[in-house]
């Protein structure tokens, strides 16, 4: 059995879609993949992911009967993940290596290299689901998520995500209005004891 530190398992999972590293992390966190999957389903319910049911921790669905989700639910999960900014230390890696350079990693999310502001997030491909992607990008103070499910090819999923993100950045922005404090008058409050 080969030893690998948690940081490298996270990197292998986020960058290279290493299912063995994903299972090892699940077992480390929860004791078993089954318990981890149960925790994932509980968390999905807490996040309002009404169309999601996990059967494993990898996303592989060839033998899974009811491993399902929706684009909306993936966006909810992605938004929650982005609250933990340190994840971007892994999801923005283009190329890296493990085991002292013996194992090379190239990010399965090609947008990391080719799309300005990409912060991640994750690709997935199975025969049932097709080529999928949760793409996240930030420009100025605007952070967007584009989810593509069921694409026929990897290239098409990236093109669809780029189109959605470009549209979002062209049409939306986070704006904080500047208000002159002197323009706001005094307010008198009366407290009534009942």
Task: Annotate each predicted stretch with a short phrase.
Residues 2-6, 194:
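Short, small-residue-biased leader/transition segments that mark boundaries at the very start
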Residues 49, 53, 65-192:
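Domain-terminus/edge residues, biased toward the C-terminal soluble/receptor-binding domains
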Residues 1, 22-32, 108-119:
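Short charge-dense sequence patches
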Residues 7-96:
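Active-site-adjacent helix/loop patches that line small-molecule binding or acyl-intermediate pockets
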């Amino acid at each position: 059995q080969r030893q690998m530190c948690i940081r490298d398992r996270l990197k292998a999972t986020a960058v290279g879609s290493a299912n063995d590293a994903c299972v090892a992390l699940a077992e480390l966190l929860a004791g078993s993949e089954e318990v981890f999957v149960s925790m994932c389903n509980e968390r999905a319910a807490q996040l309002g992911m009404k169309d999601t049911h996990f059967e494993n921790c990898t996303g592989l669905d060839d033998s899974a009967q009811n491993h399902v989700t929706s684009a909306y639910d993936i966006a909810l999960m992605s938004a929650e993940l982005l609250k933990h900014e340190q994840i971007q230390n892994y999801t923005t890696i283009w190329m890296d290596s493990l085991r002292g350079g013996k194992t090379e990693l190239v990010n399965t999310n090609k947008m990391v290299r080719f799309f300005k502001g990409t912060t991640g997030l994750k690709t997935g491909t199975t025969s049932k689901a097709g080529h999928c992607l949760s793409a996240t990008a930030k420009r100025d103070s605007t952070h967007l998520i584009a989810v593509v499910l069921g694409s026929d090819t990897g290239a098409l999923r990236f093109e669809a995500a780029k189109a959605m993100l470009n549209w979002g950045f062209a049409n939306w922005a986070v704006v904080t209005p500047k208000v002159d404090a002197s323009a706001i008058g005094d307010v008198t409050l009366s407290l009534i004891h009942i």
